[in-house]
Amino acid sequence: MLFSACADTNDQSLGPNVLGCRGDFDFTVKFEQLCFSLTPAAIFILASPWRVAHLVRKPTIVGAPLLRLAKLGVLVSYASLELSQLILITVLPFGASGIDIISSALRLAAALCMVGLSYFDHSKSPRPSIFLSAYLFFTLLFDIAQARTYWLASSTRPEIAFTAIFTAALAMKIAMLLLEAQRKTKWVAWDSKDHSPEETSGIYTLGVFSWLNKLFFDGYHKTLGIRDLYPLDQNLAATHLSERFSRHINEAKRKGHEIGLMEALAKTLYVPMILPIPAKLAAIGSFFCQPLFISSLTSRLSQSEPVPANIGYGFIGASICIYSVIAISQSLYWYFQQRLLYMMRACLATAIYTKTTEARAADEDENASLTLMSIDIERIMKGSLYMHELWGNVIEVALSAWLLYNLLGVAFIAPIVVVCICVGGVSFFMRFMGDSQRNWMAGIQKRVGLTSSVIGNMKNIKISGLTSPISRFVEKLRVDELQAGSNFRLLMLTCSVFAYIPLLLSPPITFGVARRSLDATKLFTSLSYLLLMSTPLQNLLETLPQMAAAVACLGRIQKFLQGEGRDDYRIFLAGSRRDPEKPSLDQLDKSPAVAIKDGSFGWKPDKMVLNNLDVEIPRGSLTIVVGPIASGKSSLCKALLGEMPHSQGTVTIATKFSCVGYCDQTPFLSNGSIRDNIIGYSPFDAQRYAEVVDGTMLGIDFETLPEADRTNIGSNGITLSGGQKQRVSLARCLYLQSDLLIMDDVFSGLDADTEDQVFQRVFGANGILKRRQATVVLCTHSVRHIPSATHVIALSTDGTVVEQGTFGDLVANQSYIHSLGVKAPSTSQADSEKIESDDSAIEPQINLIERAPTETPEVGVNDKSRLSGDSAAYIVYMKSMGTMLPIAIFTSGLLYGFFYNFPTIWLTYWSADAVATNPSHSFGYYAAIYAVLEVCAMLSLIWLGVLLYITVLTRSGVSLHHAALRTLIHAPLRFFTTTDQGIITNLFSQDLSLIDNELPSALLNVIYMVFVGIGQAAVIASSSPYLAISYPFLFGMLYVVQKFYLRTSRQLRLLDLEAKSPLYTHFLDTSKGIVTLRAFGFVSEDRAKNAFLLDTSQRPAYLLAMIQQWLHFVLNVVVAIIAVMLTSLAVRLRSNSGFTGASLVTLMSFGEMLSGVVIYYTALETSLGAISRLKAFDKAAKTETKDGEDIVPPEEWPPRGEIILNNVSASYEYELPLFLSIRLTTNELSSNDTQPETPTLALKNLRLRIRPGEKIAICGRTGSGKSSLISLLLKLLDPIDETLDCVNIDNTPLSRIDRVTLRQRIIAIPQDIVFLPDGSTFQENLDPSNVSTAADAQAVLEAVDLWDFVRDKGGLEAGMTVSNLSQGQRQLFSLGRAVLRRRIRARSLGLGGGGSEGGILLLDEVSSSVDRETEKAMQEVIRVEFREYTVVAVSHRLDIIMDYDRVVVMEKGEIVEEGNPARLVEEPGTRFGELWSVGGN
């Protein structure tokens, strides 16, 4: 035995309390040796080699030799003292036991390990050693307790000597702790990147979150922007994590494991997953000290004699230690856990994006990755937050059950039975949660996908008059989504009820079963054990559904990641791909640039689109591919790019460069400047840039654009005309350093003059591509350029090659090419074109306008409402609920607060009556009322949950979405040209997700915790009225903390939401343009951009999580202060043991309630930020409807179709410029309210009278104002105020007509066709308004020659996939939609199916992507179906214009000529005549 003073006591037992010695207020020596010395030292010794091995591989980045020398000196001294203790134990007559010697030896070994660990950690790590500091901190507390024991137990000289050396070692450990805590920031050899102060923070700085102080001060005093935030810790960076994660996920994919994604995460993040465990164990230990402390204190207070001073100070010291350790261990646990979550987010988001770049081009849902990256990852993070609670709660339940058994005997089985029933109930309902969540996520995915499509195509939707049916479709998806979500939330609510049963019903059931004398000590100790059992069970049962949801979302992501990716089947000859620096020139020169042998390609394995192709494309040639619509021209382009999912035969590519220039039929443009879109990720070359701008004739357009080539083109290039989009896409293709270019119908939106000039400058004999000796594959409907081709390929409708060869040979074959009637240009014409080409080659005709780009301020930075919040958001949310629901919610919260807290007071009366000589009431009386109170608490909680999670959520969700969608639909076109698509998409995804999920949860928890907290404060004060005196000061401090915290928290939450918008936009852009990105070889750069955007979005989100943990820590410190005050008052004033027990038991959860009130109030405030953003959206996107638009014409309007424009002018700039920035947050959303002094006019002084039934064609070069004229007639573009009433239709001022009604009455077909989401039926797409019969739809499809196609796909009710339709078929489908509208209108007006008295048809390049035969068929349909309509058609096909009554030629927004097209062609010097001749007619 080490000490002999207490030889006759239980000092050599495990105790843990010593009896008969040291005032019975100490641990036994054996317990201290085992738990305070031996166990920590053994753990440290086992873990140290692993840490040292990890550090040895890292580079040396810290100097500071003096600090390192000081550390080593102290450690050597400490090791010497430990050695001295071991010698004393073994040499002197202590009578030491084996555990004493082992404990001392392990302490010495641990000291030696500390020397090596400190040396390497000092040099290799930028932060103080977390592992060593944690060991020093906790063992220091243990050593202080042991030192006290040793001094009290020492009675002989050897014992005193041993204790003195132990105390000296303790002093050395304190010195070492202080030295090891020193930050090494000024000695770290950083790289060039900025670093966060977190990266140099030690465990103490991390534990109290002092590294966040600067952020809090900044957030309190100013409005934060992204630039004000700390840089992201490099260990959380996407590039740092993704490389390791991709290796593990690829390995899991090869093995085909069902939980491969979870395995990959575990292998990648195993160290971050382990780090929370020690802190969690420390927290569990400190939790279980609370009931022991309550038992000891109430036992002392129930005795008649006063509490001795030293024991009273011991109780106070114990309360300080217990609650301080709880605060620090909890903060460290959640710190490491939050870091883990954001590492998981980085891994998953990067993997999803990478898979998006590898996905097949034919994948139907391009928005799937966006939903997975946003909604699914958020739910995974929410569920994974509690992963360590799973095993931690099991330990807590087991320990509390064992302690309860020691106190109450077999009665401990009662709560276990309750727990088993609840676990069974939760397990039963969890079986349905996976499918329920998948249905809900699928509903969100459908709605967000459609909304994103609507945002990107709003102009065409408005032109088509489809705003109302599409709004109804989106709202139906929203209702379906909320219904699916309600089913899931109902399951969650049911599981939550089961989770609260142990907390509320276990105590009355347990006490009822015990039926023994229960004094205050037993009653409140038992209650504390039950609380320790039921609280983790409640957490466990509540979090199990969230964990199940996280697993389901991981399954969805794994399915996506394991989906079949693109398989590039092409064969690249040496030099073209593998070694671009050293091409095999001889081999390349002898082989064709592209060769297809026995090639068959298809989008589905059972149906090939292209069949039996044998094609060779000569090097340096211009190969033109022609054929009727749906012959496979676009599919051939995809086949050459390796993008067809199913292929047979071989495709061989032999080029010098690894990248391929590609122009898609639908131009892919990102939201940025024209220059950025042209250059992409290529290095800037001014000469090359000027060359391609001149070749595509964009210089002329730059002169009319407000910022020239730095003009922002908006999402999908919405600010550009169709021809401008095509030419920007062509310029990007030409700018790329490539010798193989594949172009799909790049002339579809160009007028004849521009088309001819672009062709000569780019493809002509001395054009850009000829000079570069590039190989060009050009698929086109513009057959007049075929004579210029080196090689021609003609495809048939069955996907085979009809003929191929030179133009002359094919004309002589008397086959398809001959049937087109195209003639080779005359010698004089060819010479003229050559001279033109030569001139342009010598002197590029371009004058690049170097204008300084407009500085767009970081909007919102000076928005003071970001500091104080938006109180109006509460009103909006309450209004969305209705009148009675808020009252019902408040009432249910009040009832729950009472019924939750009063049972604790009831136990005080029960315990007092139980020990009374003459009890006032029986056991059953108290037990029954106690049970009724708890059942009432349960019922009020259920009521509150149903109100908020089901009723309120559904009602407000529908209402707020309807308001936001209405704002979106009625927003002016200018709004969509100045606002990034990702920002608006974020409103309908992230913000509505907040309103659906976080907002109801935050509101419920605030109501729940406020009323419970008020009751708990009253219960705590019941032990001593003096404690209540401190409440004003405590609550004042809480108010200051909340105010201080909330300013920063609210801003970080808003920044979190805002920083995700660019990430979402980038995901959408990548999904839409992946074929182009892969062809250009830009995928790696695009992934780097995604990593940057992801890291940027992580910064506010991660810091928000950290400051929430700071708040937890501060409030736990407040609880510690209350505990110390309560203990001090109890032992000094001899408080009632029952009320003291009730106060201490309540205090066990009071900290959580305090934290919860502030945390969830902040969550409520920041979640209401979503509503503020919707309010700001409503304000910024002011409705396009203006005062005075009060005329709703009758159904038959316009009966005649007469249009009069009387000197009208219009400007896009004249509308209020709404520069909606990424900070779409508050009512003070910045917008530029100043009108430009001289707005650029899109239309100038137009004078035009279109007679009823007249057929008018509009032509002119691209950007001349043709589409703007269509927009003017549909009120997408408003006249300037001076000419507001200068447009009339059938004698009705256009300015007075309701816009929605106007677009429904006028039938219009846009250039870009709008379809419902994939999976919608052909019938729904043809008739979104659902007013026709199947027979009507079939008749229309037969009229436009699409019925056979639809029938082959399964008929009208079959699901439709837009990618299965060629561009020409899409335009035919759109024409069919217009024909159906005309027929339904005629029938509703009683005019029969053959025609109507009048109407207006507007056509915007409806035949730009079809061949001549199809175009003639379309014009015949228009002539027959709309013979009595007034037709205004924008067209570049001049031969079709000849059939119109009149042609209007436009230039720079003005009408420069009008007249009969045939007469204008004959007259010399006319503009139309020039266009006619240029067009090769």
From Swiss-Prot:
Its main location: membrane. It is found in: Membrane. One of its GO terms (molecular function) is ATP binding. ATP binds at residues 627-634, 1260-1267. InterPro entries: AAA+_ATPase, ABC1_TM_dom, ABC1_TM_sf, ABC_transporter-like_ATP-bd, ABC_transporter-like_CS, ABC_transporter_C-like, ABCC_6TM_D1, ABCC_6TM_D2. The keyword Acyltransferase does not apply. Residues 594-823, 1224-1477 form the ABC transporter domain. It comes from the Eukaryota. Keywords: ATP-binding, Glycoprotein, Membrane, Nucleotide-binding, Repeat, Transmembrane, Transmembrane helix, Transport. The chain crosses the membrane at residues 27-47, 86-106, 130-150, 159-179, 269-289, 308-328, 389-409, 410-430, 491-511, 887-907, 928-948, 1001-1021, 1026-1046, 1111-1131, 1144-1164. It is a multi-pass membrane protein. Residues 281-549, 887-1166 form the ABC transmembrane type-1 domain. PROSITE patterns: ABC_TM1F, ABC_TRANSPORTER_1, ABC_TRANSPORTER_2. Belongs to the ABC transporter superfamily. ABCC family. Conjugate transporter (TC 3.A.1.208) subfamily. ABC-type transporter; part of the gene cluster that mediates the biosynthesis of the brasilane terpene glycosides brasilane D and E. This is ABC-type transporter braE.
